[in-house]
Regions:
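Extracellular jelly-roll beta-sandwich "head" domains, especially the C-terminal globular C1q domain
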Residues: 3-150
Length: 150
């Protein structure tokens, strides 16, 4: 067996831009085309910013992002992701029953600075985000996970 060769160059590290942002507490009657607010910030690292209680999420780093969202409404609904007030194609997700998690996911190219939001896009009516579903503690009724992948 011969000698071990030289160590090659270190590859690129994983992107260090990601965020978990969520809502706890009732949100009454999000109107058609209304924005979903987020009461809390989880871990936010890198070029993403959010002010608790607001619906807009600021992306400060250009790149390719994986975005997953969840909304739990009080009736059948359709929610979608928007980038700078434009619908992101392929992100209208729906559920056909009340109090079920409506979950969507997309990979999208974002040029910073940009604003991401979730909207009650094409539901039949206003949607309420309720609490105390299935138990005695307030649960997360809307959330978004954003991860820069390149």
């Amino acid at each position: 067996m011969g000698a071990t060769g030289a160590t090659g160059p270190t590859g690129p590290g994983a992107p260090e831009t990601f965020a978990y942002i969520y809502n706890i507490g009732t949100v009454e009657d999000i109107p058609l085309d209304g924005l979903v607010p987020f009461s809390n910030n989880g871990l936010i690292v890198g070029g993403i910013a959010h002010e608790p209680g607001t619906p807009e999420i600021l992306i400060n780093e250009t790149g390719i992002y994986e975005i997953t969202f969840m909304v739990q409404g009080d009736r059948v609904n359709q929610f979608a992701l928007f980038l700078n007030d434009d619908l992101i194609p392929g992100t209208i997700y729906s559920v056909g029953a009340a109090n079920i998690q409506n979950t969507g996911r997309v990979i999208v190219s974002i040029t910073a600075p940009a604003i991401i939001s979730i909207r009650n896009h094409t539901s039949f009516s206003p949607i309420t985000l309720e609490t105390l579903i299935g138990g005695t503690q307030d649960q997360v009724n809307a959330a978004v996970l954003i991860r820069r992948i390149s």
